[in-house]
Amino acid sequence: MEEILQMSALELSKQIRHGSVSVKEAVEACKKQIQKAESQVHAYVSMDEKILAHRIKEVEEGIKSGRYTGPLAGVPIAVKDNICTRGQKTTCSSKMLENFVPTYDAQAVKQLEDAGMVILGKTNMDEFAMGSTTETSAFGVTRNPWNPEHVPGGSSGGSCAAVAAGEAVMALGSDTGGSIRQPAAYCGVTGLKPTYGRVSRYGLIAYASSLDQIGPIGKNVKDCAALFEIIAGHDSKDSTSADVPVESYDSLVSGGLSGMRIGIPKEYLAEGCDEEVKKALADAVHTLSKNGAVVEFFSLGMVDYVIPAYYIIACAEASSNLERFDGVKYGYRTPGATELHEMYKKSRAEGFGEEVKRRILLGSFVLSAGYYDAYYMKALRAKGLIKKEFDKAFQKYDCILAPASPTTAPKIGTSLSDPLQMYLSDIYTVAVNLAGLPAVSLPCGMDSKGLPIGMQLIGDCFQEKKILRAAAAYEQLRGEFPKAWAKEEK
C-alpha cells in the first residue's frame, strides 16, 4: 500500500493500465491513509461508499475494455466541496447548503470522469471559499498534515491537505485570490491556477465570478500539467470559457530553463515578507540562475492597490452571487418563521457563518447608492491598471517569480482573531486573479519549524507552458520534496 502512495499520479495510472495495480488497490491505499490520518487532518466533508464502489467497478471495466486509456485513468482524486457532483452532497462547507445534492456534474468533474479518474470524496474548505485558512468551514477546521497545530491554508485547504496527507493522489481546487496556490505552499504540494477562462466554471458554486477558476493540485508539476490538460478546454455552458487549444502535458513541462527570462518584483520582498521565506526564494533564484535562466529584479507598480481592489470586487460579486441563497429555492430555511421577510432574514442569519456575512455586508456597502463610484468603479479601474503593469512586465520576462505567501502556515486561531491580517496575507496571490493570469505554486524549502515554504511562477495569459516548463525544470533540480504522510511513518 505504501508503494502506491509513493507513486506520482502518472506512474500510478501507468501501473493500473498495465495491470500491476488494480483501481481498487489504489483506492484502498488512499482509504487506509484516510482511516489513519483523517481524525487529525479532517480533509474531507463527505464520502459516499456506494457511489465509490460503483465507480471503481466502472473504471476497472473501462480500462480493460479500452474505454479509458488516458494518462490519469484509474487515479483516485478528491474534489473541493464547491464543485458540483451529481448525486453527491456539495455543501460549500456551509450550513446554508448542508443538504444540497446537485442533479448534474460540474464540467471539470465530467471531464475528469471521462478520463477515467475516481472521485474519492468532497474536501473541506473555507465556507463559500471565503477565507485563507479553512477555519471558516461550518463542519470543523482542517489541520496541516505537517503540524496539526497549524492551518493548511485556504480556501482549498481540504484538497491540499488530502494530497499532502496521502489521503488522495490528486485533487481539484478553486482559486479566487490564491485559494489553490497558498494552501499548496502551506502543505508542501503543487497547485496550478490556470488563466481565467481556461477551465469551465460550469458547476462551480460562485464566489466572485470574474475571479474564480478551477485548477489541479498534485504531488508534482507533471501530474498537475496532466490534470490541467484533462480539465481545460472550451465549454459552451460557460460564457467566459476561452476557446484556446491546450498542449499535451508532456510538451507543457518540457524545454528546460535555458534562455528563460524570469523577473522578481522588488515590492514582493519588502517589509512583511518573512526572512526564512526570502532565504528559500533566494536559494531558488540561485538554482534557476545557475541552470540557464536569466533572473533579475524589477519594479511592479500598483502593488499597494491590489488588496483593496481585490476585496472590493470579490465582496461585491459575492454579495450579488449569494443573494440566491434565501431559503426559498436554494439553501437552509429557518423553521417556524411566520412571514416571508422574517424567513429571509433568519434563514440567511442562521445559514451563513461570520466571515461570509462580513463579506456580504462589505460587498453590499460598496455597491450601494452613493458609494458605487467611490469604491466599486474605482476598484475596477485599479484592476485594469494592475493588468497593464503585468502586460508591461511580460514584454520583458517569460515569467515572474514570487513567494506564494509572506509566511509559512500560521497557528490555528491566529488568523480569525485578526481578519485584516488574514486579508493582507493574500498580498502575493490576488493580483494574479485580478489580471486573469496563470500561476503555479510549488515547494522551495522548509522553515525552522519544519513547515513547507512555497514559491509561485506567474505567466502571461494562456502561457501555462512557460510557467510549467520553468516549474518542472526547477523541481527536477530541487529533487524530491519530503512527504508529510511519510514523516508520520517514521
Please state what every model-predicted region is.
Residues 1-57, 290-292, 483-490:
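An N-terminal boundary/leader segment
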Residues 13-14, 57, 270, 302-303, ...:
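Serine-dependent amide/ester hydrolase catalytic core
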Residues 19, 80, 220:
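Short, conserved phosphate/pyrophosphate- and ester-handling motifs at nucleotide-, phospho-/glycolipid
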Residues 26-30, 309-310, 356-364:
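Short alpha-helical scaffolding segments that buttress acidic/His motifs in well-ordered protein cores
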Residues 30, 52, 80, 112, ...:
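Conserved hydrophobic/aromatic pocket- or pore-lining residues that grip, position, or stack substrates
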Residues 36, 114, 165-170, 174-272, ...:
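Structural helix-boundary/capping segments
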Residues 72-92, 251, 256-263, 316-387, ...:
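Short helix-loop capping/hinge segments that flank enzyme active sites or metal/cofactor-binding pockets
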Residues 72-214, 267, 316, 402-420:
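Short glycine/serine-rich loop/turn segments
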